[in-house]
């Protein structure tokens, strides 16, 4: 027995003893309160359990009634009978658990409250009455004068009696305190033990009951799986027949890529202020965590986490020096951006570094995966960036026509692409799709930190690739782009970093090359160049600068260079517009963008046409497709219209470019825009009798309607658009339904 109060201190009646008594009384009072609360909660639990049992039994009866609905089905009847019988046995076990819990509460807790604590309180009252009597006797004995001997003798005798009575009661009370302390421990632990034993018995019985159905459940699961497959197959066949009757032309199916999530651990956590995306732009403080290749936050510990970035490989982070608040940085993903604020400059830098490191780590882990993935966790979103979206709902699946190994081999086979564009490391497995270059993993992480407005990074081995994007990468390449961005490296005597250089050296080089653009061939001041009115629509593009771009003979990059005015007399926007014309010149377009051309530059001399509209009218469909893909990758607005109210989708429809129409629809082209004559793209397609484009536009409208109703839509939409994309890339002339007299529309 653990002695809480010492009997010697009890006889001394020291202040320490009195304080100990008061402390124990407070503890016992609190114990009594909590035990009464526990009893109340236990009674509530028992009452809820009985209600649960009653509701569960009624629920089982409802399940049994399903077996008698409609024609007899032996399989369903057997299933319901076995499972309801098992559930009934489990409820019987639950009732036994409630009875055991009630018995334990009454035996242990209620007995302790009513008997143990009651006797303790009575002993306490006797003790304090004795203490009061002793205090009174001591006071009276002390107040008797010397001259009153008789009274002093009586007071002394009374004091002895009071002291003896107090000490006896004090010893009894001390014993009672020590006993109640031990009894409390024993009774509570015994209560918990009996409760756990009852729970163990209950769950053991449930386990045994369900184990008897293990084999049956396994067999039933297999049968149900087969039924679901058959039903899904029948449903899909009916939907395909339905679309076939309406459209009469459908492409074949492609296997859906598998999804796999890579491992990840906790990187950093802490409080940050987050700006809301509503109209009020309010700021709230949340607990942010970088873990499992995700950026998440929560308000309280028990709150569910909110995912800001589902896959860090799809995002970039940048500082926000122009924000009204200090210490702000922004995490940008393809679908949204999140403005965050830390408490100090140092914390802001730490968070930015942590996000960048997490991005690099995510890519490194994916690179070490022995099993190449056609579409990983988040790479489906990467595919969306190339496959774009179809209306408000968007396309949700990408396609990889030739496999990841085929894409990497095809892109790396281009002259100069077998090495990293920036550090010359062999066998690069990453690419910047808006620049058209290949990168090593370290340089790709640096490119990603620049932001998507400078470089859009994608893996050659992990992500899905649309066919038009693969062809675009093969038409550009490291040699062409480096002739633009490194034009003055030799003249400036600047040393290019190698594979063994540090990350800091590579980062400084990449920043100077793509952000500061130190090595570009300088153009005259913009005000000295012409840019308000562009050349006629059919004028050939401006040829590349001598010595700046040297394309390979026989490729899309080496078009004939007809005589033209000096490039230096053109505004970069006008140069981009000219280069997007007949036929398009991707190197010249890249040169114009490098010199700051606005990808949505408007040519006032040609009905406010944009480079994207100009590229749509190229003579060769494949050239036009790749030029449009290049402009879209660099931020071209797919819905910007000319003076006649016609956007790129209108022009593609007028010219019968089915591949371009498919590309613009995937990139979110607005189907409802009408030109100055009140015609939308579908009206034009019907008037020109272009069945392919009519099919695409009607499917897109159906997709929009499904998305507006919250429906996922039929996978047939995706199949058709993937097939048109592949056909537009492999055999574009087959899809072209243009005729020369359509220009009069």
From Swiss-Prot:
SUPFAM superfamilies: Ankyrin repeat, ArfGap/RecO-like zinc finger, BAR/IMD domain-like, PH domain-like
Domain Arf-GAP stretches: 405-527
Residues in PH domain copies: 265-360
Record field: compositional bias (Pro residues): 537-546
Gene Ontology annotations for the cellular component aspect, listed alphabetically: recycling endosome membrane
All residue ranges annotated as the BAR domain in the record: 1-226
Annotated stretches, region: Required for formation of endosomal tubules when overexpressed with PIP5K1C: 1-382
Span list, region Prevents interaction with ITGB1 when S-554 is not phosphorylated: 525-567
Residues bearing PTM Phosphoserine: 555
ANK repeat locations: 607-640, 644-673, 677-707
Alphabetical UniProt keywords: ANK repeat, Endosome, Membrane, Metal-binding, Nitration, Phosphoprotein, Repeat, Transducer, Zinc, Zinc-finger
C4-type ZnF: 420-443
Membrane topology: Peripheral membrane protein
Domain remarks: PH domain binds phospholipids including phosphatidic acid, phosphatidylinositol 3-phosphate, phosphatidylinositol 3,5-bisphosphate (PIP2) and phosphatidylinositol 3,4,5-trisphosphate (PIP3). May mediate ACAP1-binding to PIP2 or PIP3 containing membranes. Only one PH domain of one ACAP1 dimer inserts into the membrane, while the other PH domain acts primaryly to interact with adjacent ACAP1 dimers.
Described function: GTPase-activating protein (GAP) for ADP ribosylation factor 6 (ARF6) required for clathrin-dependent export of proteins from recycling endosomes to trans-Golgi network and cell surface. Required for regulated export of ITGB1 from recycling endosomes to the cell surface and ITGB1-dependent cell migration.
Name recorded for this polypeptide: Arf-GAP with coiled-coil, ANK repeat and PH domain-containing protein 1
Classification of source organism: Eukaryota, Metazoa, Chordata, Craniata, Vertebrata
Gene: ACAP1
């Amino acid at each position: 027995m653990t002695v809480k109060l010492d009997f010697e201190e009890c006889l001394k009646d020291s202040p320490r003893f009195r304080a100990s008594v008061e402390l124990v009384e407070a503890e016992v009072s609190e114990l009594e309160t909590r035990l009464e609360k526990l009893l109340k909660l236990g009674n509530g639990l028992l009452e809820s359990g009985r209600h649960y049992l009653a509701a569960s039994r009624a629920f089982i009866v409802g399940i049994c009634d399903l077996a008698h609905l409609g024609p007899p089905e032996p399989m369903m009847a057997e299933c319901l009978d076995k499972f309801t019988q098992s559930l009934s046995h489990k409820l019987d076990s639950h009732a036994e658990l409630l009875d055991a819990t009630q018995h334990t509460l009454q035996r242990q807790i209620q007995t302790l409250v009513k008997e143990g604590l009651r006797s303790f309180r009575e002993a306490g009252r006797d003790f304090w009455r004795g203490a009061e009597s002793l205090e009174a006797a001591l006071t009276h004995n002390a107040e008797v004068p010397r001259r009153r001997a008789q009274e002093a003798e009586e007071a002394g005798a009374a004091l002895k009696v009071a002291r003896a009575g107090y000490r006896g009661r004090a010893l009894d009370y001390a014993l009672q305190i020590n006993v109640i302390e031990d009894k409390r421990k024993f009774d509570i632990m015994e209560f918990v033990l009996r409760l756990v034993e009852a729970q163990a018995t209950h769950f053991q019985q449930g386990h045994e009951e369900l184990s008897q159905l293990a084999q049956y459940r396994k067999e039933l699961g297999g049968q149900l799986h087969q039924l679901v497959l058959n039903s899904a197959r029948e449903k899909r066949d009916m939907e395909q027949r339905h679309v076939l009757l309406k459209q009469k032309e459908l492409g074949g199916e492609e296997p859906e890529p598998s999804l796999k999530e890579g491992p990840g651990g906790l990187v950093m956590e802490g409080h940050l202020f987050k700006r809301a995306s509503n109209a009020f732009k309010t700021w709230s403080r949340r607990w942010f965590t970088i873990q499992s290749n995700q950026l998440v936050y929560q308000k309280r510990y028990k709150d569910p986490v909110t995912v800001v970035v589902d896959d860090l490989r799809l995002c970039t982070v940048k500082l926000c020096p122009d924000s009204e608040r200090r210490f702000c940085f922004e995490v940008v993903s393809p679908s949204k951006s999140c403005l965050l604020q830390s408490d100090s400059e140092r914390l802001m830098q730490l968070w930015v570094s942590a996000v960048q490191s997490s991005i690099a780590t995510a890519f490194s882990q994916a690179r070490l995966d022995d099993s190449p993935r056609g579409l990983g966790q988040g790479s489906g979103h990467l595919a969306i960036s190339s496959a774009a979206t179809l209306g408000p709902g968007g396309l949700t699946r990408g396609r990889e026509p030739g496999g990841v190994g085929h894409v990497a081999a095809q892109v790396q086979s281009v002259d100069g692409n077998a090495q990293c564009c920036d550090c010359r490391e062999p066998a690069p497995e990453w690419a910047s799709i808006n620049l058209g270059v290949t990168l090593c993993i370290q340089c790709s992480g640096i490119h990603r930190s620049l932001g998507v407005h400078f470089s859009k990074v994608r893996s050659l081995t992990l992500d899905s690739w649309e066919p038009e994007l693969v062809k675009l990468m093969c038409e550009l390449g490291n040699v062409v782009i480096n002739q633009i961005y490194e034009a003055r490296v030799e003249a400036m005597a600047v040393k290019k970093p190698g594979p063994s250089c540090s990350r800091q050296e590579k980062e400084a080089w990449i920043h100077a090359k793509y952000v500061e653009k130190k090595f570009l061939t300088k153009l005259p001041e913009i005000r000295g160049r012409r840019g308000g009115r562009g050349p006629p629509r059919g004028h050939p593009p401006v040829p590349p600068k001598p010595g700046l771009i040297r394309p390979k003979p026989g490729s899309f990059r080496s078009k004939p260079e007809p005589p033209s005015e000096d490039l230096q007399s053109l505004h970069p926007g006008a140069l981009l517009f000219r280069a997007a014309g007949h036929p398009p010149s991707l190197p010249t377009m890249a040169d114009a963008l490098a010199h700051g051309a606005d990808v949505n530059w408007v040519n006032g001399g040609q009905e406010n046409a944009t480079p994207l509209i100009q590229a749509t009218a190229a003579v060769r469909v494949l050239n036009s497709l790749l030029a449009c893909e290049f402009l879209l990758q660099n931020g071209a607005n797919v819905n910007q219209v000319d003076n006649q109210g016609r956007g790129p989708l209108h022009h593609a429809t007028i010219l019968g470019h089915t591949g371009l129409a498919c590309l613009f629809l995937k990139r979110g082209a607005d189907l409802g825009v009408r030109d100055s004559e009140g015609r939308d793209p579908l009206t034009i397609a019907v008037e020109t009798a272009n069945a392919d484009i009519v099919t695409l536009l009607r499917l897109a409208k159906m997709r929009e309607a499904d998305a507006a109703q919250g429906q996922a839509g039929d996978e047939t939409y995706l199949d058709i658009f993937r097939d048109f994309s592949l056909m537009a890339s492999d055999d574009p002339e087959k899809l072209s339904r243009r005729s020369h007299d359509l220009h009069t529309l």
